[in-house]
């Protein structure tokens, strides 16, 4: 019957602890990246759903982002008086709610609309987000038309470990594109290439 000495057992336990200490942070970073990427896809899908709502309803439908208790909520509204979805029309009830309020953190723990400090602009045609992760103009509304076009803008999304993604909305087509910020190179890369 083979037996192990106390020194052999301590060596094996020490090696296992070292491997675990190295692997756990990398595993947590991978989980955070996956969760943040999924949240970016979720946000892009919600925008595309709103675009399809506008086409099928033959009316302008928009997503409004609101800061509530330090977290952003987003909800869909349909134009009620043919002048576009406006904040004052939402408040007065003219533009009615068609998609209930939602929060990224409710589906993806630790993920929010945010921008890490000193984040560069996505490209030469845009500005850096600074402290505003919702780059849709002063109203924080992205509108989609019955012809499939939209207003343009960017939504910055980050996770607990500062994994950074952006959902870009292109006005001429109403389509979205997801990019990830590579901290090593300091560049934005298409999420589809990662």
Model-derived features: where do they sit?
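Glycine-rich phosphate-binding loop
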Residues: 1
């Amino acid at each position: 019957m083979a037996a192990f000495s106390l020194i052999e057992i301590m060596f094996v336990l020490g090696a296992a602890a070292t491997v675990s200490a190295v692997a756990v942070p990398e595993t947590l970073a991978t989980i955070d990246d996956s969760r943040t990427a999924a949240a970016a896809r979720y946000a892009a899908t919600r925008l595309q759903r709103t675009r399809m709502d506008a086409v099928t309803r033959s009316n302008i439908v928009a997503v409004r982002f609101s800061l509530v208790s330090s977290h952003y909520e987003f909800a869909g509204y349909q134009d009620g008086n043919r002048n576009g979805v406006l904040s004052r029309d939402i408040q007065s009830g003219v533009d009615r709610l068609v998609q209930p309020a939602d929060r990224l953190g409710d589906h993806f723990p630790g993920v929010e609309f945010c921008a890490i400090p000193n984040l560069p602009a996505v490209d030469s045609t845009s500005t850096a987000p600074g402290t505003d992760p919702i780059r849709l103009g002063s109203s924080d509304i992205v509108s989609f038309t019955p012809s499939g076009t939209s207003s343009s803008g960017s939504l910055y999304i980050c996770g607990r470990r500062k994994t950074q993604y952006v959902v870009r909305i292109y006005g001429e087509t109403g389509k979205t594109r997801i990019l990830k910020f590579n901290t090593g190179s300091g560049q934005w890369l298409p999420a589809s290439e990662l």
